[in-house]
Every structure is written in C-alpha cells, then in structure tokens.
Amino acid sequence: MKPTLFSFLLLFAIPVFAQKTDKQLQSKIEQAISGFQGEIGIYVKNLRTGKTVNIHADTIFPTASIVKVPIMTGIVYKMNKGELHYDSLFTYKDSLLYEGEDILGSFKSGEKIALKKLLMLMLTTSDNTASLWLQTIAGGGANINRILDSLGFKDTRVNSRVPGREAFRAIYQWGQTTPKEMGQLFEMIYNRKLFSSDLCDRMMRMLAKNYWDENEAISQIPPTIAVFSKNGCVNKTRNEAMIVNAPKNPYVFCIFTKNNKDISWTHENEAWTMARKVSKLLWGYFGTKP
C-alpha cells in the first residue's frame, strides 16, 4: 500500500504532553505587558527544561507575514519528497506581480530565478510576490493546510487564495495561527523533527537571515547569538516568532497582537515597544542564566 500524506507526517506530529509553567517568568511578563491597548498572546518555552509561559497562547491571531513559515514548510515537504530541489529554476512572469516594493517585482518577464533565491526573498526580506508564487509552487494553500493538519496543527492555516476559507480570510487575512502552535512548529524545525536533519538545518539557516531587526523584539538579542525568526505586521497587528539559541537555555518566543490601538509605523509603536521590552526581559532571564 502506498503511504498517504497523513501516515508519513504522523511520524513527525507534534507531541502532546503536560508542560510545566514557569510561574516566576509568567508573572514578570504579565507585569511587562500590563496596560497594552490591544489583544496579545505570548508563548515562551525553555528548550532545556521544557518549562513554558502561556498567555492567551491558544488564541487565534492573524499571522501577517509569519504565514511564510507554513509556506516554507510546504516547499520543504516537496523537497523532502524529491519533487523540488533547492536549485530548481522557475521563470518569472509579470502576472505574478503583487503590487508593492518587493524586489522580485523588478524582474523582467521571462527571467529565471532559483528556488533558493525565492525562499531567501520570502524569509529574509518578506517579499510578497515571491511568497505568493511559492504558495503556488507548494501546491497551493489547501495543500499546505493538509500538511499542517497532518502535523497536528489545528488552527494554523493559509487563508488567502484558498477556496472555502473566505470567511476566515475576512477575519484573519492571509493566514492564521496561535502563539503556541507557531512556537511548536519552530521547535520541530529546531529539534530536526519536521523533515530530515539536513532539511531542518536548511530551514534554520533561512530563518537566521531576517532583514527586519530594528523595531522588532529580535533587536534585543546580542548579534553574536543565532536567532531563527520571522516577523509579520499589518495595521493593527505586530507579530514575531523565534527561537533564540542562547548558550545554555535556548528558548522559543512567540508574541502576537491584534486589534491594536496604535497603528503607527514608527519605532515607538506601542506593540513594537512592548515586544522589545519582553524580549529584553527574556534575554536577561535566559541568556545569562546558568
């Protein structure tokens, strides 16, 4: 019998087990975010001890550009099956253009580009034209959602350009997730349990090259420390998901917001300021902890 998508991915599905809460850290974070004018969800996990912080971590939030991590997962799934290769070439067409300031949009119709460069544009600069093209190359959002479901993720979904998900798109736009599920996806990559070790290593290398590091929480991590991250933002949303490879206590940190009162795009934006504050707190807690 030919193995199904579900039977293959079930081998790597997220583990379900009781997690201990770091009550001291949870209290510190709750104090840090007190008074925030919007809705917030936070998931933190010490990957050495397994202790967690869950603050509305099972609430669904818009992904904004963090949807590009599930899209990457769909692409790497095909690489794992041998249907795509890191050096596979694709031909750009003007019909692929998504209006904006994307680098790929400057290409001329007929120019060729390697899959690895499309992935770099999606994950490093968050190029939307590249991302929507990669969503198609991965088999479309519905196929990505089937993969996510088989991995055990029930709330993480691609909504844009997916028949039957129009109502979800109206609420959450391109994609949706919870802080906990996104943190678990990052953890599976970090622990090399999503695909082969080589492919998970490749995913981490791609996630380690985030261009957006000035306003965001990642700015509070010393540049000598590897951080695997993706951020996303639209008017009322500021999100970040990351694993900080602290020497003795590597940790997951996911912070999602929605319905934010402050929709400014300055460094002082309330959500960005809060994310930096929590990130600094976490680095002080984990980064120097024996």
Task: Name these PLM-found stretches.
Residues M1-K23:
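Bacterial Sec-dependent N-terminal signal peptides
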Residues Q19-T59, L281:
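Beta-lactamase-like hydrolase cores
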Residues G41-K45, N54, P70, T91, ...:
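Soluble periplasmic/extracytoplasmic beta-strand elements of cell-envelope proteins
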Residues L97-W133, G141:
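Conserved catalytic neighborhood of penicillin-recognizing serine enzymes
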Residues L119, L132-F186, Y190:
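Mid-domain, small-residue-enriched loop/turn segments at the edges of structured enzyme/sensor domains
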